[in-house]
């Protein structure tokens, strides 16, 4: 028997860059993982968001192709 305790089912989301980069808060909104910039700011400042496996507390952190954001059991892959 296996017991998996995830907040929500694992999901991988890809965001294709339209520009050179996307900011972390915008990426969370674009992926549909938060409803607003205010919520994005709170979860980021609370240390709930990882970028490439490291806690990131800057909402304005620029994300480039190849980077991975993790939040609430989900992964966002930034694609060029």
Describe each region flagged by the PLM:
Residues 20-65:
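A basic, amphipathic helix-loop patch mediating RNA/tRNA/ribosome contacts
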Residues 11-22:
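A detector for short, charged/polar N-terminal pre-domain segments
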Residues 13-14, 68-80:
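A positively charged, amphipathic N-terminal helix/segment that binds anionic biomolecules
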Residues 1-11:
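N-terminal amphipathic/basic-hydrophobic helices that include classical n-h-c signal peptides
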Residues 5-7, 37, 54, 74, ...:
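Intrinsic disorder/low-complexity detector
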């Amino acid at each position: 028997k296996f017991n998996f305790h995830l907040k929500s089912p694992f999901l991988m989301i890809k965001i294709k860059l339209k520009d050179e980069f996307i900011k972390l808060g915008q990426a969370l909104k674009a992926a549909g993982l938060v409803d607003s910039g205010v919520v994005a700011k709170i979860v980021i400042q609370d240390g709930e968001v990882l970028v490439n496996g490291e806690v990131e507390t800057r909402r304005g952190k620029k994300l480039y192709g190849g980077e991975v954001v993790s939040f609430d059991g989900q992964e966002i892959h930034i694609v060029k």
